[in-house]
């Protein structure tokens, strides 16, 4: 009997600090906003050319407006906000591996939950009972985010950017139906861990529709012109680029697998992807020297970077599809142009649908 009493006592002690460590609220968009958000992905497909470890699908950029407040740490300390990716990694599939790309880094769900510092810090609500002078006299500046008693932050608003992806563990059979459905890609919480309480006010972002994965007996091949995949703008002066933008063209040719085993019809969506800073509603990439890059379609309309749109439709008898693009560089309004060589990298990515 004594033994069981001691076990219960130790169990309670272990959980008492946890309530303090998880003293942080995060919402979608604004204070008191939703703490559960759901996004449904469109059906996608696995090409027959997929190999173990390949990414066979990824989402568009998911930009989540996050508002965090109510740091109730009893010791008056500030609290850092963390994005806990793959917070509930238990969901698994024999053939598919889920993961999250956050700030350009991939986090497979097999690695378990990962905490990522959002570089956002919130001061304790309790410290506001003291004046800045009293905080300084007690030597509590180090408990503050800014270390300045006159600069207290009780809430933060920021945008978190990430992508969900699916990799192939091993090639599934043609008629395979995945059990994957709802998946929480991120939860915003404190550094102490994720709050799983029923009354938790910690924003979770769900993706559902992952069970709509189709397995194809087909694939496509790509050929980019120029073959070296380098768009060279040559040499030009500061004056030249100020007078007018510079353009170069390139094309992408797509060929459907023509083997006798290919019987499925499918569509292909594409995205021009970059980790660089974007502007103009993500339609222009800042090169970093006072210039910007846009990619234009046949109607001279700019593409949105990091967003998938329909590229080619192979549901008919079409076997070859070629599309022409224009790369345009121009000045950034109000920016100083720095002369010298420059380069930027853009990836052409596809999803099968």
Task: Locate predicted features.
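Bacterial N-terminal signal peptides that target proteins for export
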Residues: 1-8
